[in-house]
From Swiss-Prot:
Oligomer status and interactors: Heterotrimer; containing an alpha/SCNN1A, a beta/SCNN1B and a gamma/SCNN1G subunit.
Extracellular side: 99-549
Gene: SCNN1A
Pfam families assigned: ASC (PF00858)
GO BP term, pick one: sodium ion transmembrane transport
Name of this protein: Epithelial sodium channel subunit alpha
Annotated compartments: Apical cell membrane; Cell projection, Cilium; Cytoplasmic granule; Cytoplasm
GO CC field: acrosomal vesicle; apical plasma membrane; cytoplasm; motile cilium; plasma membrane; sodium channel complex
Annotated GO MF terms: ligand-gated sodium channel activity
Modes of activity regulation: Originally identified and characterized by its inhibition by the diuretic drug amiloride.
Family: Belongs to the amiloride-sensitive sodium channel (TC 1.A.6) family. SCNN1A subfamily.
Bilayer topology term: Multi-pass membrane protein
Length: 636
């Protein structure tokens, strides 16, 4: 029996040795794997807890280590957790305020005083008389006759001019029917002032028992009319007369040739910087309301330069202001109109100019002011108007008023089919004339109301230029010439200019335009919140709340990236687990076959095991041992 157990003991010893070797091999593999993990170029944490604990133990952000070092005291851990995340919230609230201020794009206004030579601005003077009445008398005779009758009906005023020669009467008879028809479609009426009228139409300074004046413009079928109301009869008559006047001008093909372009008949004397002006120093244009206009220093190739301030270092003009041959219903003001503007900019006399009084010396002192705005995201300005959706109808450079007037004229041409006589025409358009465009007045005045209410969007579309040069003006007045000197002054002027001044003091005026001081003001904008300022503010807040640096931010970014990586790894592992759970489960036939191969456990022979053996055989070795025993029993 003992001899039979010896081979069996040998087998068991061999199995023990094999089990020990297998265990040592597995331990070596585990150690090698740990070594490879420690020496790996890129390693990942096995759980979120491991990641968070590593971050708190090694980060340079203040307060993070207190989240793990006090984990044995849950109260402290909870306190530091609340404090840590509350501090984070406060810091990012401050970040939000800083970012909001940065993206509002604030600017700093820089004020500079420059003392250098000035470029003298352009100066425009107008006669305040559109045309010589004698040159247009034949064309205006019929309109004057209808106006005279209208004034008689409304105000019992006999407007007798004493200028009705035979030629004018024949002209009136030939064209009376055509003009009378159009005037009758746009009548001037007097209305009883309504107590329920709007405040604009019902001025509180005018008695309610008084009358208000209006003229009507109707559409082609006379089914709808627009009434242009005026509280002043003078304004109403002048506007009504001007409306018919521009219709007459649009019919005259050679209206521009009626201009009085003789410089000497309007400008008696011209001197700049105590040097006499010549013809190369001015340009001429005509305005349908303000008449002949002369612009000095408009030539950009030879501009006047002013080295010193003062009245003797500027422009001095003596102009004629008599009204012997003015159109009475248009020229209600005597004198001249002057405007100071930049070169290559149109002179809008109705907006930026002011009148010069006859018999008065007007001294205009100027202060130059330049404004440079930041474009792009800092302000809604334009560099040259190329990005403004309005076609420039003027030949000058872009200004806000050029854009607004071009926008209005384009709207008139689009809606009414013709252009207003006061503005330049787009290509292919014609000026409005109620002989050709019957209801253009109705269209124009309704469009004018929309324009003033900004329903056309012109004031919104037209942006301010980024660079603007303005001149602040202040005027002083004195009697000129004085009583003691007027005799010889008028005598010399009448002999020198070969013009007989009948009204004397009301026939001339003097204008002086000069710089008030040596320096001029320049306003510039600079960004108040740059990227450098933004980073400085963010760094200050980060250091205030956590006492950290840029590298601490990098650590936080690394934590976020590791968190994302672990999440991806766990997600992939979870998907693999779900796929392995979908494999087929072994059937009962397979189980029965397995049990048929192995005998019942009680039938196996028992082997004696030495008590000094600590390591147990592996499952595979025992399985092979059982199979051998079964085969030996079957052999026996």
């Amino acid at each position: 029996m003992k001899s039979e157990n010896q081979p069996e003991d040998k087998r068991i010893g061999k199995l023990k040795r094999e089990a020990n070797m297998q265990k040592m091999k597995e331990a070596a593999e585990v150690e090698e794997k740990k070594k490879e993990e420690n020496e790996a170029l890129v390693g990942f944490f096995h759980s979120y807890q491991e990641l968070f604990q590593f971050f708190c133990n090694n980060t340079t952000i203040h307060g993070a280590i207190r989240l793990v070092c006090s984990k044995k005291n849950r109260m402290k851990t909870a306190f530091w957790s609340i404090l840590f995340f509350f501090t984070f919230g406060l810091m990012y609230w401050q970040f939000g305020i800083i970012y909001r201020e940065y993206f509002s794009f604030p600017v700093n206004l820089n004020l500079n005083l420059n003392s250098d030579r000035f470029t003298f601005p352009a100066v425009t003077l107008c006669t305040l008389n559109p045309y010589r009445y004698s040159a247009l008398q034949n064309e205006l005779a019929e309109l004057d006759h209808i106006t005279q009758k209208t004034l008689m009906d409304l105000y019992k005023y006999d407007m007798s001019q004493g200028q009705n020669n035979r030629k004018a009467q024949l002209s009136r008879k030939r064209s009376y029917r055509s003009l009378h028809y159009h005037v009758s479609r746009h009548p001037l009426h007097r209305y009883k002032r309504d107590s329920q009228a709007s405040i604009e139409d019902n001025n509180t300074q005018v008695d309610k028992n008084d009358w208000k004046i209006a003229f009507s413009v109707c559409n082609e079928n006379n089914t709808d009319c627009f009434k242009q109301m005026y509280s002043s009869g003078v304004d109403a008559v002048r506007e009504w007369y001007s409306f018919h006047y521009i219709n007459i001008l649009s019919r005259i093909p050679n209206a521009k040739s009626l201009d009085e372009s003789d410089f000497a008949s309007f400008i008696y004397a011209c001197r700049f910087n105590e040097v006499t002006c010549d013809k190369a120093n001015y340009t001429h244009f005509h305005h349908p309301i303000y008449g002949n206009c002369y612009t000095f220093n408009a030539n950009s190739s030879n501009l006047w330069m002013s080295s010193l301030p003062g009245i003797n270092n500027g422009l001095s003009l003596v102009v004629r202001t008599e009204q012997n041959d003015f159109i009475p219903l248009l020229s209600t003001v005597t004198g001249a109109r002057v405007m100071v503007h930049n070169q290559n900019e149109p002179a809008f006399m109705d907006e930026g100019g002011f009148n010069v009084r006859p018999g008065i010396e007007t001294s205009i002192s100027m202060r130059k002011e330049t404004t440079n705005r930041l474009g792009g995201t800092y302000s809604d300005c334009t560099e040259d108007g190329s990005d403004v959706p309005v076609k420039n109808l003027y030949t000058s450079r872009y200004t806000e008023q050029v854009c607004i007037r071009s926008c209005f004229q384009n709207s008139i041409v689009e809606r009414c089919g013709c252009g207003h006589y006061f503005y330049p025409l787009p290509s292919g358009a014609v000026y409005c004339d109620y002989a050709k465009h019957k209801a253009w007045g109705y269209c124009y005045y309704k469009l004018l109301a929309e324009f003033k209410a900004d329903l056309l969007g012109c004031f919104t579309k037209c942006r301010k230029p980024c660079k603007v040069t303005e001149y602040q003006l202040s005027a002083g007045y004195s009697r000129w010439p004085s009583t003691a000197s007027e005799a010889w002054v008028f005598h010399i002027l009448s002999r020198q200019n070969q013009y007989n001044i009948t009204s004397k003091r009301n026939g001339v005026a003097k204008v002086n335009i000069f710089f008030e001081q040596w320096n001029h003001k320049s306003n510039g904008e600079s960004p108040a919140f740059t990227v450098v300022t933004l980073l400085s503010q963010l760094g200050s807040q980060w250091s205030l709340w956590f006492g950290s640096s840029v590298l601490s931010v990098v650590e936080l970014v690394e934590l976020i990236l590791d968190f994302i990586a672990i999440t991806c790894i766990l997600a992939i592992h979870w998907l693999n687990m779900n796929r392995s759970s979908d494999l087929p489960i072994p059937t009962s036939n397979t189980t029965d076959t397995f049990h048929n191969v192995l005998p019942p456990p009680n039938t196996l022979p028992r082997a004696s095991v030495d008590p000094d053996v600590i390591t147990l055989p592996s499952y595979k070795s025992l399985e092979s041992l059982d199979l051998r025993r079964v085969s030996s029993q079957q052999t026996e």
